Design a protein with these regions (language model features):
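Short beta-strand segments that buttress and anchor functional surface loops
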Residues: 50-56, 173-179
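Membrane-proximal interfacial segments on either side of biological membranes
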Residues: 1-48, 59-171, 182-244
């Protein structure tokens, strides 16, 4: 007979993970590992995370909380402690940065990343979840390129009160950066992503495409030219675009 309580030691890893939704690649090339000690209450099917470390590319997080099996459902209350990560770690989550040139990238800035999942998952409903990311005074530079990107600021959040994934909202009330004497800022928000995506976005600034090669390592056969000047805003639903 199994003891009512025991300790489990888990170690899992996966490489080159790709996330695809409706034929759209959301992320690729992700490497993830999890090392964890789990206190298992076998009588109540409750598993509490104790010592653990989750790594996703260069980002490291500690998981606090528990998971409980309830028939076909799963109850959960988990928070992610992401303290200790720096701006370069966060950039590793962006496929365009997490390449062979990542080792040549230096970055600095103030970063805050928090996330949690709480509630019951069933065959038809999801628990509530949230993620908040803040970046201030950010900058990055590749060692073999002449210029850097500075004054990076970002506030972003993902929210869902539980139930349907269609209740998920994404808010980016602030994004800004400067490079080559130019500044660019933008905002965005997304709602009802599963049924009829509703969006609102704005952008302001000037981007010299010819200067991109001075801040980012382009492929040898890629050449960018031209100047983009933006002072625009847009709002609508995906169904409206599909009708055009």
């Amino acid at each position: 007979n199994l003891r009512k309580k025991t300790e489990l030691i888990e170690q899992m890893s996966a490489a080159d993970i790709t996330f695809i939704s409706d034929s759209t690649t959301l992320a690729k090339g992700i490497t993830a590992t999890l090392k964890a000690k789990v206190d298992a209450d076998l009588k109540n099917n409750k598993y509490t995370l104790s010592e653990n470390l989750l790594s996703v590319n260069a980002v490291k997080a500690r998981l606090n909380g528990w998971v409980q099996l309830a028939g076909d459902d799963i109850n959960t209350d988990i928070t992610l402690d992401c303290s200790g990560n720096n701006f370069k770690d966060i950039l590793s989550l962006v496929p365009a940065f997490y390449t062979k040139d990542f080792a040549n990238l230096t970055a600095s800035g103030d970063v805050s990343l928090t996330a949690w999942v709480r509630g019951r998952m069933t065959k038809t409903a999801y628990p509530a979840f949230a993620l908040d990311l803040k970046v201030a005074n950010g900058s990055f530079k590749y060692a073999d390129l002449p210029k850097s990107v500075t004054d990076i600021a970002l506030r972003a959040s993902v929210r869902n009160a539980g139930g349907s994934l269609d209740a998920t909202t994404v808010e980016i009330p602030r994004f800004g950066a400067s490079f080559g004497g130019q500044t660019f800022s933008a905002t965005a928000s997304v709602a009802t992503p599963m049924s009829d995506l509703a969006f609102k976005a704005s952008a302001n600034g000037k981007i010299n495409l010819g200067a991109i090669k001075e801040i980012y390592p382009l492929d040898k056969d890629m050449s960018l030219n031209g100047i983009i000047t933006a002072d625009v805003s847009a709002a609508g639903r995906m169904s409206q675009i599909e009708k055009q």
